[in-house]
Amino acid sequence: MKNGQWKQHRKRCNMLLTIKQLQVKYGKQTALQINSPINFEKGERIGVIGSNGAGKTTLVKAILGLTAYEGRIVTELKPEQMAAHMQSNAYVTTMPVKRIMEMILDTKIKDNKELQELITFFEFEGCLSKRYNALSGGQKQKFTIIMIMMQKAELTFYDEVTSGLDFETRQKLMEKMVEWYRDKEDSLIIVSHYYEELEQLVDKILLLDQGKVVAFGRTEELFRKYCGDAIFILDNNPVSSSLTKSFCALKSPNHLIALSCRDKEEERRL
């Protein structure tokens, strides 16, 4: 095999998924339109970011075969080789969490070291005896994440894993995710509204807006292009608001002020 042929062969072997000319419509409305090919390679962690209605969840559903689409999604993965954390999960609400976990995973916690490790890592031991409907929002997310991680899938999707959580709970949960995946080579597609959730966890960002691709590339490159050299996050109070009026503000939770610095001089001033 010639050198050029070998490179092409190796590239194909590393390719996990390719999207070609993808279109999703709900009635007459186009929810997602991807015109240029997008490639996902093994071991890559892709962050999909955009506002409500950008097409993020629609993309995940199309890849999983949960919604009709036109175009091509090329992959050798079978459905059972993919795992997905979706925004809504239909667990039995009145059953103890431990029983739900053991029934779905078909294993006993006391006999499964991997499951024990995840429960300990996410500090979930105190939740096992609770009924699902008694869990807090953050505890429910931890439960679903543990269930997803136990599948050890070739490709894992996380769709708005911090949806509905307060800022502190959201931060702590994402710190756990970053720590867990730090030294692993799992292939991930993570959907979020917030860039700061993805910054330490993903290699590339797919930025969607109104169903169209705005950009796709390395995380740091897109950060500099759309956010500047640095971002400062401050508590939103009258003093901070008054002192930072001349700087470029980014979208952020109501109790915070996020500011973009376009260069080192602006960063020094701030």
PLM features: residue spans?
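A short, flexible loop at the N-terminus of ABC-type nucleotide-binding domains that lies
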Residues: 13-19, 23-36
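The feature captures the beta-strand-to-loop junction immediately N-terminal to the Walker
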Residues: 49-51
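Q-loop/switch helix immediately C-terminal to the Walker
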Residues: 88, 93-109
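Conserved ABC ATPase "signature" region
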Residues: 112-127, 149
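Conserved ABC ATPase signature
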Residues: 131-135
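Catalytic Walker B motif of ABC-type/P-loop ATPase nucleotide-binding domains
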Residues: 156-159
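H-loop/switch region of ABC-family ATPase nucleotide-binding domains
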Residues: 191-193
